[in-house]
Structure formats: C-alpha cells, structure tokens
Design a protein with these regions (language model features):
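Acidic-glycine-rich active-site phosphate/pyrophosphate-binding loop
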Residues: 21-30, 80-94, 131-137, 193-201, ...
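Anion-binding (especially nucleotide phosphate/pyrophosphate-binding) glycine-rich loop
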Residues: 60-96
C-alpha cells in the first residue's frame, strides 16, 4: 500500500474572498472551520491534479506505472462529460496495461472506490490497482454564492493497493449506503439529459448547488450510524482504531460525530481548515498526510467514513 496527494499552489484565504462582506467572511471559519482553500489555475483540470497525486503515490515506493493493472478515479467534477477522466490519467502515467474508469458518488466517492477496488482484487481481476480521487470544484461553483463557494477547495489523493496472499494489511471491510429519494439535495442541475444545455434557463443551472442545512443534518445522522455499523460488522472496538478519517466537510460535523460516538476528537484527522471541502478527495488527502506525519504507521487500524450527494454514505476499515 502506498499513498500520495496533491494540492494546487494557489492559496485562497477567507480575507481574499472580497465578493463577500467582511461580516460574511468572518462567518466562514465560525460555521465550518475553513480558513484557506486551494484553487487550480485556469489552465489546470481535474485530471492534472489526479496525475500529480498518482505520480507521488507510485514514486513513493518506486512502483512502475506500466505494472498497474487498473485505475479507478473518483470525481464529481470531471474534465468532460465523456469520456472517463481516468482515461487521460492512464495515458499520462504510461499505465498501458491498466483498465481505467470513473465513479461518481460525490463526497462519498472514495469509500465507494475502496469497496470497488477490494472487490476487483478479491475476484482476482487484477493484482495492482490505483484508486485516485480528484476534484476541482472551483470551476463548477458560482463565485457569488455564499452557500457554496467559500467552503470548497481543489485537490487530489491516491492510494495503491496490491494483492498480497496471507497479508493482514489492506482493506478489511466496507459498508455502503444510498438514499436516492434525496438525490436533489446536492447536485449540478444542468448539462445532463434531464436539463440539456440548450434548455438551461441560464448559466446558474451549470453550477453546483447544495441545501446546506439538510446536508448538515444528514451527515450528523448517517455519519455516526455508518461508523457504528462498520465496527459492529467487524467486531472491532473504537478503542482499537488509531485514527478516524472522515469526509472533511465541516469541523462542527467532525466534532459532532466524535461526541456522539464518545471518541476523543484528537483521533479525528482534520485538514479542512487548510484545504476546505475537497469532496471525494478529502479522505485520501487526509490519509496521505496522516501517514506522512507519522500519525498512522504499519499495522494501525483506520476508519474512513464519508457522506455526500446521492445521498450516499460509506465507511471502510483498513489496516496500514
């Protein structure tokens, strides 16, 4: 197992968001904990971030890209409607022997991706597979919309999984869930077959939308539930978990989940203060940083928990 992450170099602090009033800018940190976020430059696209994170991941253990057998890319902000953004990642990495495809479960994408990778390895479809989560919300947000624009950032994370017979490391268990009756709570309304470009009432239909209060309530409800379900199904206690890596949506959600589960908040990895909400990339970026900082070492158990559009939510138990 190896990890990598990449954040674009453009740092946007709350005070730089001059389109909002000083009073509104003060509320950003109070409501969410976000102090800064990273934005890509005009010439960068989602696959560029994915490629950079993937290269870091592979170079860390000197793994040749041509030995990859599969690439799964989680993104809800793809380069184009089609083809899969993963195809450009495969080409630029030189992973000529790897199949490549995208998945889109919005902020839950990494949990769903981990479960897919686990199934592919267990079915012996492949022995080495790269999961990448890459998001560039800065280009799908309305910069004047205070309900979304200040809270998101761009970034990518990657993790390489390899089949190892007899090993106790890797993906131990996954739990996934969806409530499609609320699929409109987090969405980009226009651009698909439901609302084609030529029928869009205006450019605002192409922007990301979110009903924040409903998302907060959903996360506080289903986040703890999916973590408890994961622990119950595996027989692992919360005391045995070294770190909880939850989707980096809001510091109040993270602290709320910790309180509801009776887990010290120090066990929760937090980077949203620096990067904002990087959607499906958030947990893989946080995992990479936790490993690089020595908070997770070989043999440690970690829980990854995500919640987002669809509505969807998931959790994974991994051993480093």
């Amino acid at each position: 197992m190896s990890t990598g992450s990449f954040l674009p170099g453009k740092v946007i602090a709350n005070e730089n968001l001059s389109q909002f009033s000083p009073e509104a800018r003060k509320l950003i940190a109070e409501k969410t904990g976000v102090q800064t976020r990273r934005h890509a430059v005009e010439t960068e696209c989602t696959s560029d971030l994915a490629i950079a994170a993937a290269r870091k991941c592979l170079q860390k253990i000197e793994f040749p890209p041509e030995n990859l057998q599969g690439i799964v890319l989680s993104t809800s902000s793809p380069d184009r409607l089609l083809p899969a953004t993963a195809t450009r990642v495969q080409h630029e990495l030189g992973a000529r022997s790897a199949f490549a495809f995208d998945i889109n479960s919005v902020c839950s994408g990494s949990s769903f991706g981990i479960a897919v990778v686990d199934a592919l390895i267990r079915s012996e479809t492949c022995k080495s597979i790269l999961l990448v989560a890459s998001e560039m919300y800065s280009k799908i947000l309305n910069r004047k919309d205070f309900t979304t624009y200040p809270f998101f950032g761009d970034g990518a994370g990657a993790i390489l999984f390899q089949a190892e017979s007899g090993s106790s490391r890797g993906i131990l268990h996954s739990c996934l869930a969806t409530d499609g009756s609320r699929n409109d709570i987090i969405c980009v309304p226009g651009g698909g077959t439901m609302l084609p470009f030529e029928k869009m009432p205006g450019p605002r239909s192409a922007y990301f939308r979110m009903r924040g209060e409903e998302v907060f309530a959903f996360s506080m409800d289903r986040g703890p539930q999916i973590i408890l379900r994961l622990l119950e199904e595996t027989g692992v206690t919360k005391e045995e978990i070294k770190c909880f890596i939850c989707h980096q949506a809001n510091i109040n959600i993270l602290h709320g989940i910790a309180g509801l589960l009776g887990i010290p908040k120090e066990k929760f990895i937090v980077n949203l203060d620096r990067y904002g909400n990087t959607a499906s990339a958030s947990v893989l970026i946080a995992l990479d940083e936790a490993i690089n900082e020595g908070r997770l070492v070989q043999g440690d158990l970690a829980v990854i928990a995500t919640f987002g559009g669809g509505l969807s939510w998931g959790a994974n138990l991994i051993r480093l």
